[in-house]
Amino acid sequence: MDLIEEAIKLESDLIRINSVNPSFGGKGEKEKAEYVKKKLMEYVESYNIENYTLKEYNIIDKYGIERPNIVFKIDFGRDKTLHIISHLDTVPEGDISLWGTNPYEPVIKDGKIYGRGSEDNHKGIVSSLLLLKMIFENNIEPKYNLSLIFVSDEEDGSEYGLKYLLNNFEDEIFKKDDLIIVPDFGTPTGEFVEIGEKGILWIKFNIKGKQCHGSTPENGLNADIVAFNFANELYNGLYEKFDEINSIFLPEYSTFEPTILKNKVENPNTIPGYVEVVFDCRILPTYKIEEVLEFINKFIKNFEFKKYIKHYDNSIKAEITYEILKSENPNYTDENAEIIKELKKAIKNVLNRDAKLCGMGGGTVAAFLRYKGYNVAVWGIGEETAHQPNEHIKIEDLVKMAEVFYEILK
């Protein structure tokens, strides 16, 4: 089976295995991890691979679900190891009506394969497995040891994934001079290498008014109206205040986007008395997360809800509080690190493109490694359809990614 055929087989099998993160109502990664283990052992037997270890670092999560983490290492007798870290979990399919195909049944069209997880993060899993095939079919002597790591829980903070590994088994798995790639990013042409990530702040605002009948707004306080206007004014205020530009990042500005707005009312004739609004903030390293929170605190204190609402119970005041759902500082990799130099050379040799260093707003597991002093490159090739309906990836790009990894090793 050639590389394209193998890529199609692997990607198709993975798409058929639903591994939605349990935090989003899914059953988790166990079945997908079992498939990956099976494929690894098939390669071990087919190519008579020696000096390998395959270890599982599993943990039971708060839902009682087993969350798998796999570390497959081959010792080629080198001082340094190349680690490639992919994640097993996916986000849900979202609004199924927006899909042109079944999200969990692979469909191939115009050289692309469609399905949930096809890009995020099957491209990492598939290219890692293809790399093994390339190494042993070409009988090379790699200049680094190889470590393929497949983790859980990337889509919801990595408490049961890479964070768990680093907190409990760091010295067993990693050395500070190792080379690490996280294939969880990518542009269609593959020249961008992510070396930094914005700070992340997820913040939920709890907006309390007073529930009443829809025909008598003067007896309550419409939390919807307060929430709509609060979110709109805060949105504009944050973008105006924190407006610095840094061209290395994609996008080059901080972002402050309201993503969730919900109340507890299901019938049309009740005015809601409580609304939740969630903002997803991605903050350039120019600013500290504390500065953003300070601005938000002042904004809440000065927000005048009365000018936005015509009829309400004058004895009631809107209450706005918040809780931080997630807060992570920005992180960087030294652009002169060995992994960056090696990856840039490989991109040039395989893709015939000059690598460009960039930062991004999305968070990856690279952050947790960088916080501990490791140099990590986040790289891949993709159609930029992660988390979207009709997620897909070019089949040839799965092979190209493996070829770039191979170029680093040979």
UniProtKB/Swiss-Prot annotation:
UniProt xrefs under InterPro entries: ArgE/DapE, Bact_exopeptidase_dim_dom, Peptidase_M20, Peptidase_M20_dimer, Peptidase_M20A
Entry-linked CDD domains: M20_ArgE_DapE-like (cd05650)
Lineage: superkingdom: Archaea
Residues that, per the record, bind Zn(2+) 2: 120, 155, 387
Enzyme Commission numbers on file: 3.-.-.-
Biological process, per Gene Ontology: ornithine biosynthetic process
Annotated residues for binding of Zn(2+) 1: 87, 120, 184
Enzyme class: hydrolase
A Pfam family of this chain: M20_dimer
Cofactor: Zn(2+); Co(2+)
Keywords, comma-separated and alphabetical: Cobalt, Hydrolase, Metal-binding, Zinc
Transmembrane parts of this sequence: none
NCBIfam families referenced in this protein's UniProt entry, alphabetically: DapE-ArgE (TIGR01910), PRK13983.1 (NF010589)
Family according to the record: Belongs to the peptidase M20A family.
Protein name: Uncharacterized metallohydrolase MJ0457
Lineage: Archaea, Methanobacteriati, Methanobacteriota, Methanomada group, Methanococci
